[in-house]
Amino acid sequence: SVIIPVHNEEKNILSLTDEICVALDNLVNYEIICVDDGSTDDTRDKIIQLTSRLRNVRLVQHEIKGGQSAALYNGVVAAKGSIIVTIDGDGQNDPADIPILLDVFHSNLSDNPVLMIAGWRKGRKDTILKRVSSIIANFIRSRILGDAVPDTGCGLKIFRRSDFMEFPAFKNMHRFLPALAIRSGGVVISEVVNHRERKAGISKYGTFDRLWVGIADLFGVAWLLRRKFPDANPHQYKSDN
């Protein structure tokens, strides 16, 4: 299941969905879930057009804007697939990277009970201010959480649906998915992905939003990581009677 959280992306959602279909053409069973997070433009109508043209496209509609984490969460809840792929709705993530990340995921699946593949936008096509603020935000987060993931803000991620549903759900959780996977005893593998310039629309985050928004959540997640149950190696005693 491919989850696309979108808000006011009427000029990007059609071409992005078509690109995903091309990238996943060799897969027999997949679905695309577009979660419209209370858009005020024609995004919803564009997605409805897609659902009438493509049988594997579904719409989850937020009547009011709930935020990216809520859109992601409700998309995963609605998903029928056991493997989840997330991708941003602005078209800057390249759908052609999805099959590559899926290969990495399946190659490492048997060795790890909880596994997440996280995209790494090493050559970002953003302004210098955005790149600098993102570097600072990733540095602060990594120092506090110790997740050693270079780019948690990349929308391209792959994980099991069942693993995600075990994560605690909270506002801005999408910023901390790798840390939550590690908290669950998992492994996060970062893979370099292509990053493209935004062709249309405007960014939903200001230049320094990614630095300051979620600071309280950052310390909350740090507390959560410290409060993890110790591995007590539990087993049930069986009586001989």
Model-derived segments and their meaning:
Residues S1-T127, S162, E166-F167, A179-R183, ...:
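Structured catalytic core of nucleotide-sugar glycosyltransferases
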Residues L24, V149, Y205:
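Short clusters of hydrophobic/aromatic residues that line enzyme substrate/ligand-binding pockets
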Residues V76-A78, D103, S133-A137, G206-D209:
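Short, hinge-like loop/turn segments at secondary-structure boundaries
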Residues V77, K130, K157, H174-R175:
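Residues that recognize and position ribonucleotide moieties
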Residues H106-T152, K157-I158, D163-M165, F219:
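Short, flexible, basic/aromatic active-site loop/helix in glycosyltransferases
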Residues G146, K171-N241:
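Hydrophobic helical membrane-anchoring modules
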